[in-house]
């Protein structure tokens, strides 16, 4: 599998901010996992803190502890599996590209992300909201994250870091507006109130 360019050596270990109990993180270090044929190893460059992260930190409503939070992240590809050629939109991927990711469709890795009907998303997971496992690099609150087969990943190399970190929150906004339109209550030029910011 392609590796990082000379001078950009990949360490053998990575640190994660592991939430080990409510309102408590521990900085833990783990060996970097092997990168499978369909996986991508990303060096984390930035991650936003979502309201969901705050809820998980305070109350663990999803029962995820221990967990590495962070789902509004972005970073640089440092290693790719041999089968990884393009992102979820068909744009070519290579070591050094900047990426974002969101869902993992573990039950059906071939689900069409752009299918507006979204018939089966019951088996979807989100990086940063995965219970800990033997990989450990499951959230963006870490040095590295392993993007696994069946994940949505997008090449956003043309954007600066601040813009890349805002992609996931903006996607949530667009999704919320699209869902609101399906209620039949909203019409073109409807006035709405946006309450809260997360």
Question: Model regions: which residues?
Answer:
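Glycine-rich Rossmann-fold phosphate-binding loop(s) that bind the pyrophosphate
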Residues: 80, 169, 195-198
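NAD(P)H dinucleotide-binding glycine-rich loop of Rossmann-like/cofactor-binding domains
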Residues: 105-192
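Short N-terminal strand-loop motif that marks the start
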Residues: 1-74, 143-145
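An amphipathic alpha-helix/helix-turn recognition signal
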Residues: 11, 91, 96, 168-171
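Beta-strand segments within the central parallel beta-sheet cores of soluble alpha/beta enzyme folds
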Residues: 99, 190-196
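Glycine-rich beta-strand-centered segment in the early N-terminal region that forms part
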Residues: 31-47, 60-113, 156-159
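Short loop segments at secondary-structure junctions
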Residues: 22, 78-84, 149-151
């Amino acid at each position: 599998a392609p590796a990082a360019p000379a001078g950009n050596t990949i360490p053998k270990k990575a640190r994660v901010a592991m939430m080990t109990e409510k309102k408590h993180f521990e900085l833990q270090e783990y060996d970097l996992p092997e990168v499978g044929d369909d996986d991508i190893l990303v060096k984390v460059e930035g991650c936003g803190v979502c309201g969901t992260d705050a809820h998980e930190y305070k109350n663990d409503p999803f029962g995820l502890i221990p967990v590495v939070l962070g789902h509004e992240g972005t970073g640089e590809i440092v290693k790719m599996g041999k089968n990884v050629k393009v992102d979820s939109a068909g744009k070519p991927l290579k070591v050094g590209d900047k990426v974002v990711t969101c869902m993992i469709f573990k039950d059906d890795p071939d689900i069409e992300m752009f299918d507006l009907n979204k018939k089966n998303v019951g088996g979807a997971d989100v990086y940063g909201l995965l219970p800990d496992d033997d990989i450990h690099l499951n959230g963006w609150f870490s040095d590295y994250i392993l993007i696994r087969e069946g994940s949505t990943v997008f090449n956003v190399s043309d954007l600066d870091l601040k813009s890349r970190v805002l992609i996931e929150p903006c996607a949530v906004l667009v999704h919320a507006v699209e869902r609101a339109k399906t209620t039949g209550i909203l019409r073109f030029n409807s006035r709405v109130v946006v309450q809260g910011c997360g």
